[in-house]
Amino acid sequence: MLFNYLRKPNPTNLLTSPDSFRYFEYGMFCMGWHTPATHKIIYYITSCLIFAWCAVYLPIGIIISFKTDINTFTPNELLTVMQLFFNSVGMPFKVLFFNLYISGFYKAKKLLSEMDKRCTTLKERVEVHQGVVRCNKAYLIYQFIYTAYTISTFLSAALSGKLPWRIYNPFVDFRESRSSFWKAALNETALMLFAVTQTLMSDIYPLLYGLILRVHLKLLRLRVESLCTDSGKSDAENEQDLIKCIKDHNLIIDYAAAIRPAVTRTIFVQFLLIGICLGLSMINLLFFADIWTGLATVAYINGLMVQTFPFCFVCDLLKKDCELLVSAIFHSNWINSSRSYKSSLRYFLKNAQKSIAFTAGSIFPISTGSNIKVAKLAFSVVTFVNQLNIADRLTKN
């Protein structure tokens, strides 16, 4: 069933942490990122064709269209094509980074399975289930936002009698006839659905990583808070519980290390692009867009915002979760514990003080503050265009 991984908790059939990526893996298979056990050759050929269509033909087609048709572009069409061009250039790099470090994805899933083994109580397993459902809901929300942009742009162009993205097509001249126009428009829309889905896949996985990581950090904190609270346990048993918590924390650190290479590079590319693309979109929306194009542009801006902001916000929450874990360790019931227990606790406390953090391209931290600073570039672009009256000049020309 399509929505089976959004179901409510059932004590006899709960989801596990690796199920957080279930819909994402469906998308991986459709985009050629996940090789099946059978028909590998056909799958490889199809994967190469999809990648070439989306990552090679799309930016080249836009460049050719610029050279051949730029004199016929309206300002609205020009800005739409420019914002698409920048994203089409960044998309292959994001896809490449994920696939270069795809071993980290599979390692992260194995580590999540190991973390699940520590979830022995029904309450913990239900907490994991709810976290998995949140991840799968996030994927479907992203899918809706990105698809809404593609469909709304197609509809706005169709209602205006213009091509949605003006991508060069060597086989169909959209000016010849009405049927040629629709062939070119449908070809562009099909291309964009694949390209947008590739972009979606490379944008959503950092968020999925972060959401399920927060669940296991919370469960670890709750286990730490319950240390030495059972009067029926001996000092040796309490120390074993502490050692298990230390091992859980090591699994979490290993998980963060496994996902870090792909995440940092992907977010770095997104930070480079978001300011420019958001600025072009705002110029288009404020100065040139009609009602239909405006709706499509708003959908595009929504897509730009969810590229980075949710994961940046989750990174801030992860930092807070790490601080809460340190506080839980320090305030746990250790005063009357054995010397050996206290020694292990100090070791745990020292390691836990190193927050789980990610940096974009190993240059600046991934956080809400960094995201806002990058997004400010968009307002700088709009101010620059407004002060130089570039919008008026484009309209007159």
Curated annotation (Swiss-Prot):
Its main location: membrane. GO terms for cellular component: dendrite membrane; plasma membrane. It holds the Pfam family 7tm_6. Glycans are attached at N187. Keywords: Cell membrane, Glycoprotein, Membrane, Olfaction, Receptor, Sensory transduction, Transducer, Transmembrane, Transmembrane helix. Odorant receptor which mediates acceptance or avoidance behavior, depending on its substrates. The odorant receptor repertoire encodes a large collection of odor stimuli that vary widely in identity, intensity, and duration. May form a complex with Orco to form odorant-sensing units, providing sensitive and prolonged odorant signaling and calcium permeability. The atypical heteromeric and topological design of the odorant receptors appears to be an insect-specific solution for odor recognition, making the OR/Orco complex an attractive target for the development of highly selective insect repellents to disrupt olfactory-mediated host-seeking behaviors of insect disease vectors. Odor-evoked OR currents are independent of known G-protein-coupled second messenger pathways. Interacts with Orco. Complexes exist early in the endomembrane system in olfactory sensory neurons (OSNs), coupling these complexes to the conserved ciliary trafficking pathway. This is Odorant receptor 98a.
